């Protein structure tokens, strides 16, 4: 009777395996002790014959319970030390048995930390991990999907048939399977059968590499096989706060900076040409540059311009070029459009060797609905909120993370640490923070849910951001964490232990909008809008601000920076030079978007590359020269960066000359007596003898003039500098009487000796 029950149970389990409804295959497969012997069962769909080899002896199998369940009796526990010999369709092969590996990969401590949301290195357990142990070669798969009915690994190895390799469900909703015959480079997905019987094919949320779009499978990839050479850079970076140093950022999109011809293929190290990844149909016959080509071309370019950092728009894997990378499906993988993870690591390695930091745009606020992604991952709203009033951005067509779920927060926080630890990045810019902080963001009345206190704040998102920043600075004290936050949410750059969000920099969106609005006005009417220029100083010390002229301001009909400016071409260039120079002298760190450094004329288009041909023309060369010299001056003059976040570092001389649209101020730092005088003329009028007060008598050297001929200006200036004269103005007893060029910014430095 007992044997009949046992047989019926085995047949039932086999039936469930065949129909992808078994969440506990180890309960029946592999070696099992029964009546003093070891019954070893192998699941091998569509095999014609299976034999087992153990200790040089071959055991024939039978199929008493199911045509695909092959059984043999062994006289001792084979553990995982046996081979299965498979004949299928006239082709034979030998391998280890996936279900011989019964030990848990993710242990109790790992599960506990993950369930708490505190496993900061969860990527070392989740995903696909290659084992090169001589006794256990293969790949361990691990995925979190607590609501799934069953999960299988699918790929070329099993003709994408989920009946072949069912995974074992462990505690905490974690599923595991060791597959001996898979190797680096193999493509896989998870076939997830839901409780409702639906089948989803999902890419690995923790995958380290994915196929080039439009394909979306995950690729087995090694992680720890790169030889870093930047230890001194990392040590120096983490030894002190970076925000008290000069920071000048070149924001860019790798796929649209520069293209090459598809006929000009990238040659691999082994001499073989790499299949080109077409950039777009907009310019047929063009392809993306690879990470190695960007290493060769981009890094010297950025170094020559004098920027301290490169900011990359999202390079995490994403299916749609038109999302600019902001709709991520592969959170733990640099996009394969440009190459491999190791090639991207080499790009960062070389950046550090050339003294350039790397900042990544990070998008923890939302994710797309693509079927292979996180949406409805295991048949339930696992990563997102179920209620669209809190779980969906309808305007963007994306879903919002459920920050109240520990495992979801863990997925994101660990992802943040992953990029710093595995790829040695130096900073992040968190996109669309305002959309995370407010439940009613872009939502009409009645389409959002108040929080537990009746307010519109997303308290769970606040806690997540605080946790992410706290953990980041615990691990990497020299990191940059930059918030793109467009509202007046308080204490964005205050530490979490005093209630702040914990970022150390925030984009100054108010300054950006005010300045662009101001410079778009005809200069003759700017006298009525002087407050747009001066207002930013009134709140400058409420946060640690970064001034940014970003990609968002040069798309969707807004024009590129040069073409925002009024007037003829000469005035457009002069206005652009004046704005950039004023930006470099205003308190706050700096970020500009690619193309601004030479006066790009066309709007940025993600499917095109920059207008490099413009550099054949002198005015565009002039803008580039201006940026080169501004960055050099900026790094060499501590007054321009050392006290960015201290009121001591800035003092108005005169901000009330509205009739002339002229402002003047001082920049200084508290460790020396050196300081700079900055004077800006935002009209086309040339003032031959303009007086401003200064605190010290003596000689003031003109160290920068945006109207210089080198920059494409009229070259009106002050013959290298000016001596003070005794004249009471602006509450000072000394004055400079200077030539003030049209649409320009001039910088003077007090000299102890001429």
Curated annotation (Swiss-Prot):
Keywords noted in UniProt: Carbohydrate metabolism, Glycogen biosynthesis, Glycogen metabolism, Glycosyltransferase, Transferase
Organism: Prochlorococcus marinus (strain MIT 9515)
Any matching Pfam family: GlgB_N
Pathway assigned in UniProt: Glycan biosynthesis; glycogen biosynthesis
Encoding gene (name): glgB
Complex formation: Monomer.
Name of the molecule in the record: 1,4-alpha-glucan branching enzyme GlgB
Catalytic residue list: 431, 484
Statement: the UniProt record of this protein carries the keyword Glycosyltransferase: yes
EC id: 2.4.1.18
The reaction(s) this protein catalyses: Transfers a segment of a (1->4)-alpha-D-glucan chain to a primary hydroxy group in a similar glucan chain
InterPro entries: A-amylase/branching_C, Branching_enzy, GlgB, GlgB_N, GlgB_N_E_set_prok, Glyco_hydro_13_cat_dom, Glyco_hydro_13_N, Glyco_hydro_b
Reported function: Catalyzes the formation of the alpha-1,6-glucosidic linkages in glycogen by scission of a 1,4-alpha-linked oligosaccharide from growing alpha-1,4-glucan chains and the subsequent attachment of the oligosaccharide to the alpha-1,6 position.
SMART domains: Aamy
MF terms (GO), sorted A to Z: 1,4-alpha-glucan branching enzyme activity; cation binding; hydrolase activity, hydrolyzing O-glycosyl compounds
EC class of the enzyme, as a word: transferase
GO cellular component, one term: cytosol
Entry superkingdom: Bacteria
Family membership noted in the UniProt record: Belongs to the glycosyl hydrolase 13 family. GlgB subfamily.
CDD domains documented for this protein: AmyAc_Glg_BE, E_set_GBE_prok_N
GO biological process per UniProt: glycogen biosynthetic process
Cross-referenced NCBIfam families: branching_enzym (TIGR01515), PRK05402.1 (NF003811), PRK12313.1 (NF008967)
């Amino acid at each position: 009777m007992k044997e009949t029950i046992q047989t019926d149970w085995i047949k039932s389990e086999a039936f469930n395996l065949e129909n992808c409804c078994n969440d506990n295959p180890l309960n029946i497969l592999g070696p099992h002790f029964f009546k003093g012997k070891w019954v070893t069962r192998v699941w091998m769909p569509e095999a014609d014959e299976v034999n087992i080899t153990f200790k040089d002896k071959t055991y024939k199998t039978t199929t008493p319970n199911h045509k695909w369940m092959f059984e043999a009796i062994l006289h001792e526990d084979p553990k995982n030390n046996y081979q299965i010999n498979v004949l299928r369709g006239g082709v034979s092969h030998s391998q280890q048995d996936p279900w011989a590996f019964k030990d848990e990969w993710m242990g109790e401590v790992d599960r506990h930390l993950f369930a708490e949301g505190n496993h900061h290195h969860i990527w070392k357990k989740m995903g696909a991990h290659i084992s090169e142990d001589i006794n256990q070669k293969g790949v361990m798969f691990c995925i979190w999907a607590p609501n799934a009915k069953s999960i299988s690994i699918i790929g070329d190895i099993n003709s994408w048939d989920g009946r072949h390799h069912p995974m074992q469900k462990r505690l905490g909703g974690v599923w595991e399977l060791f597959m001996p015959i898979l190797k680096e480079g193999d493509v896989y997905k998870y076939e997830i059968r839901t409780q409702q019987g639906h089948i989803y094919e999902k890419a690995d949320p923790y995958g380290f590499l994915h196929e080039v779009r439009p394909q979306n499978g995950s690729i087995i990839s090694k992680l720890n096989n790169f030889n870093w050479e930047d230890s001194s850079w990392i040590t120096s970076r983490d030894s002190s706060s970076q925000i008290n140093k000069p920071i000048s950022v070149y924001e860019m999109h790798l796929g649209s900076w520069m293209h090459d011809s598809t006929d000009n293929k990238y040659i691999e190290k082994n001499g073989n040409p790499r299949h080109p990844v077409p950039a777009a149909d907009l310019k047929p016959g063009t392809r993306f540059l690879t990470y190695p080509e960007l290493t060769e071309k981009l890094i010297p370019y950025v170094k020559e311009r004098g920027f301290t950092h490169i900011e990359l728009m999202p390079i995490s894997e994403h299916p749609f070029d038109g999302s600019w990378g902001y709709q991520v499906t592969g959170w733990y993988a640099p996009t394969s459009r440009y190459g491999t993870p190791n090639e991207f690591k080499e790009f960062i390695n070389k950046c550090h060797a050339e003294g350039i930091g790397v900042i990544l745009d990070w998008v923890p606020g939302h994710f797309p609905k693509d079927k292979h992604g996180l949406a409805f991952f295991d048949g339930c709203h696992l990563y997102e909120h179920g209620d669209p009033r809190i779980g969906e951005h309808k305007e963007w067509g994306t879903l919002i993370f459920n920050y109240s779920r520990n495992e979801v927060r863990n997925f994101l926080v660990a992802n943040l640490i992953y990029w710093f630890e595995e790829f040695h990045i130096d900073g992040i810019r968190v996109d669309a923070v305002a959309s995370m902080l407010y439940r009613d963001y872009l939502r009409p009345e009645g389409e959002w849910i108040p929080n537990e206190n009746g307010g519109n704040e997303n308290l769970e998102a606040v806690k997540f951001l605080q946790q992410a920043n706290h953990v980041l600075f615990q691990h990497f004290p020299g990191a940059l964490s930059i918030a793109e936050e467009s509202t007046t949410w308080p204490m964005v750059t205050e530490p979490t232990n005093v209630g702040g969000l914990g970022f150390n920099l925030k984009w100054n969106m108010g300054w950006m909008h005010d300045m662009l609005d101001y410079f778009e006005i005809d200069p003759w009417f700017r006298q009525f809008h002087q407050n747009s220029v001066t207002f930013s100083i009134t709140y400058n010390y409420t946060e640690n601000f970064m001034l940014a002229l970003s990609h968002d301001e040069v798309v969707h009909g807004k024009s590129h920076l040069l073409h925002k400016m009024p007037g003829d071409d000469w005035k457009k260039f002069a206005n652009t030079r004046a704005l950039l120079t004023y930006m470099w002298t205003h308190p706050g760190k700096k970020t500009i978007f690619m193309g601004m450094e030479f006066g790009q004329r066309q709007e940025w288009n993600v499917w095109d590359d920059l207008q490099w041909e413009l550099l054949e023309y002198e005015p565009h060369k002039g803008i580039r020269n201006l940026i080169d010299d501004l960055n050099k001056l900026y790094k060499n003059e501590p007054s321009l960066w050392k006290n960015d976040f201290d009121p001591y570092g800035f003092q108005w001389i005169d901000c009330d000359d509205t009739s002339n649209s002229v402002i003047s101020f001082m920049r200084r730092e508290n460790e020396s007596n050196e300081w700079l005088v900055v004077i800006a003329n935002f009209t086309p009028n040339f003032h031959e003898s303009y007086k401003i007060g200064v605190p010290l008598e003596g000689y003031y050297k003109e160290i920068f003039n945006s109207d210089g001929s080198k920059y494409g200006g009229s070259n009106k200036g002050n013959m290298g500098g000016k001596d003070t004269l005794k004249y009471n103005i602006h509450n000072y007893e000394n004055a400079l009487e200077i030539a003030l060029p049209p649409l320009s910014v001039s910088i003077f430095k007090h000299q102890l000796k001429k």
